Amino acid sequence: MRSSSTSATAVHSILAEHLIPVPEPLVVALRPRGEAGGEAPARAVASRAARALLDGPALEAAGPEAWPPWLAPHQIPAAERLSAILARHGGALLADAVGLGKSYVALAVALAHDEPFCLVVPAVLVPQWRGLLARFDVDAPITTHESLSATPCRPLPPVAARCRLFVIDEAHRFRNPDTNRHRALARLVIGARVLLVTATPVHNRLADLLHLFRLFLRDHALAALGVPSLRRATLGEVDASSIAPAAARLVVARSRGRVQSGYAGGPIALSFPRRSDAEPVRAGSAPDSVVEALVTGVGRLTAGGTAAPLLRLMLLRRLASSLPAFRASLARHEAYLDLVERAAADGRRLSPREFQRCFPRAETLDVQLVLFPVLLEQAGAAPVTGDRRELARLRALASDTRDLKADALERLLDAVPGKTIVFTDARATARYLLQRLRTRRAAAVFGAGGRFAAGEATRHEVLRAFAPAAQGASPPPPALETDLLIATDLLSEGLNLQDAERVVHYDVPWSPARLAQRVGRIDRLGSLHEGIATVTFLPPEPLAAALALEERLAAKIRAQVAAGSAQIETARGALGESPALDWCDRLSELARRAGDAAPIGAWAVVRGDRDAAVLIIRLGGLVDAIVVEGGIARADPVAATRLLAHAFTAEPAAHTAPTLGRAVEVAASLVRQRLAAVQDARWRATDRDRFARRLIPWVLSAGRRAARRGDAPQLATLDALVSRLASGMTAGEELLLEDVLSRREPLTVRDLAAWHERLPPLGSDDVGFDVELIAALVIQPAT
C-alpha cells in the first residue's frame, strides 16, 4: 500500500490490502513474460541475476579514480558495495575482519555521499579519528558513545544534529537495546543513513546483529527474505538459518581469505603476519586446594535473591583473574550487603547510584546490564547472616599465597622475549601484575589512564612508549622503553599496536568477540613482524567447571558462525574464516563480468554436474534466489551464487521446454509461503504486544467513522497511518511512538498524525505482494 491517498475513496486503500489473498496462480506470474523474457546467453543471464540479487542501484565498476587515492585496491569493492547498500536500505554494516582498514573504507564511503556526516566513536578513539580526518583534510563533527550513554543524553552540537549520515565506529557497543546509548542513538538516526563499523557485531547471540539492523530497518523489512519480524527474530522466534542470507544484503563482512583471493584483477598481495597459537596454559591464582575451597565457599553465598547466581559468577570471574581482584570483589560484595541491609531497614530498594558504587561499570560492563535491573527489583530483604560469615572465611582463605598463574606468565616471558600485550578483565589484576613485573620494562593502561613502573602517566604516553612505530611517535627515552603492556579490555578496540608480536589472554573474556578484538591490536595489515603469537590462560579444573566458561564461549562462537562473522577466535586461537557472507561480495564481481545484462525474465541452460535450476525472483519488494534441485525448492543465495559463477564458463545446453516449467511449479509453493509471511507480518500476526497490532484496528475503526462522515482529509491521514503501522518501525520510530502512548491524556488521531509527520516518508519501495521472475538458469548434466 502506498503511503497516502487524497481521493474520497481513500478508505478502500486502508481497508483493502489486508483482505487481499495471496496471488494465484503463481505459476503464471513466475513464467517469463512475453518479449521481456526469452533465451539469452548464459553469461548475460548470470550477470542479470547477480545484479538483481544484489538488490541495489546499478553497480558498475567505476575504477580506482572514482575513490580517494588513499583507498587501497582491496578496499574499493567494499566501499562500492557499502554505498549501494546505503542507497537501497538506508543503512549498512561494515564488518570486515580485523586489520583490513575499516576506518579508511568508512571515511571514503562517507565522503562519497557528499553530505555532512557525523562520527560516533568511543572517547578513547577520538584522537585517532581526529588524526585520520586531519590527515586527509576532512572536517566532520565527532560525538562519543559516552555522551550518548549519559542520563540525560547530552545534546549534540548543532552541526552534528543537522547531519543525515552517521558513521558508528565500534558499533557492537550498541547491540543491547536496553542501554541508554542504544536508545539515544536510535532516536538520533531516525530518517538518517547509518554506517555501522565493527569487526565483531555478534558478541553473545545472533540477536546482537539484529538489534544493530533495527537502528535503520523497519521491523518487517526482511519479511520477503524469510525474516518476518526483526524484533521476533531477536527473541529466537525466527529460524536462524534464514537470518544470515537475509543479513548478507546489509553487510560487508569479508574474510581475509576472500580479500586475498582477489577480484577481477587477480589475487591481491596483502602482508599479514603468520599466526602461531600456543596451547592454552591452565593455571590458577592459588594452589588447587585453595582454589577448590574458595569455589565451594562462593557457592554458599545466597544474597541477591534471583540475582545470586550472577553475583557468585562475578566473584568466580575475579578469582580466575587473580587473588587481588578476588579480594577487591569480596569487598564490593560486602558493601552490597551493607547497602541492601540499609535499604531494607528504610523500607526501600537500592537506587541505581548505590548499585553503581558496588559494581563499577568499567569493571563489570558485560554483567552489569543483566545484574542492574534484577538487583533493583529485589524486595530489599536483609541477606542471611551466613553470607557475612562466609565472606570472612573467604577473605582468610584468599590471603597471599603462591600465585601459580603469575608464575606461569613469568616463565612464558622468560622463554620467548619480545613485545607482549597482556590482557586482563580486572583493573586490580593489571595493577598487581604491573607491580610484580615492574623490572621487565612494563607499563599498564586501564580506562583513560596509564602507568609506568616508575609512576603515573597518561594513556597516550604509555602507548607511544610501547608502540612508537604504530603510534607514529619517536622512540622513547631509554628510561621509558616498554616491552610489556598490561591492559584491560578498554584497550582492545580500534587501536594499532603492531609493534608487539604477542598477545596473552591472561583472563578469558565473556565473548569470543573480545578475543578477536584483542588479537586485532597486533594481527594487522603491514605488521612489523613476520609472525605473531597468542597464548590463552584457562582457569584450573574446579574453577573452570564452576564458571562453565568454555561452554559459554562455544555457544557464542556458534552464534558468530551462524551470523557469518568474518573472523572468529577461540581460547585456542583462530577458528578459521567464516565465508558465510562472502557470497554477496562474489556477486558484485559477477555483476561486472559480462557486458550487457540480459533483459528481465531471460533464461539460459548450461551443462553441469547436476540437475538444478536457479530462479531469481522479486517478491514483496525484495529479490531472492530459489534453487530447485531433486524436486525440492529452497531459498539459497549462497548455492545460487556458485551456480551463477559456473554459468560464466559452462557450455550451453539445448533447452527442453518442460525443464524450466517444472522448476517454476516446484518453486511456486515456496514463493506462496513467502508471500503469506509478508502478509502475516503486516496484518495477521498474533504478536499482541506490538504497538501496531493494537493501533491498526483502532485506526481502521476511526476510518469507518470518517467514511460515514464523508471526511476525505481524515481518511487520507488514516491511510498514511495504517501504511506506517503496517510497515513496521525502526527502533527509534518505536521509541517515539512509545513516548506518545505513555502520556496520561487519552490518545487521539491527531497525536498519531503528529508522530507520523515527525518521521521520514515511507518511500516508494512498498510494492505489496507483486511477484516477478527476474532471471532463470537451468543446469543439465551431460548425457
Describe each region flagged by the PLM.
Residues R2-G91, R164:
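Charged, low-complexity
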Residues I14-L15, L19-P23, G34-P41, A52, ...:
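C-terminal accessory region of SF2 helicases/translocases
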Residues S47-P73, E80, G90, K102-L107, ...:
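SF2 helicase/translocase NTPase motor core
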Residues G63-L71, A97, V105, V109, ...:
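Conserved Helicase C-terminal RecA-like lobe
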Residues I142-F174, D178-G191, L196-A199, L215-F359, ...:
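Inter-lobe coupling linker of SF2 helicases/translocases
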Residues H211, N496-D507, A533-T536:
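A short beta-strand element within the Helicase C-terminal
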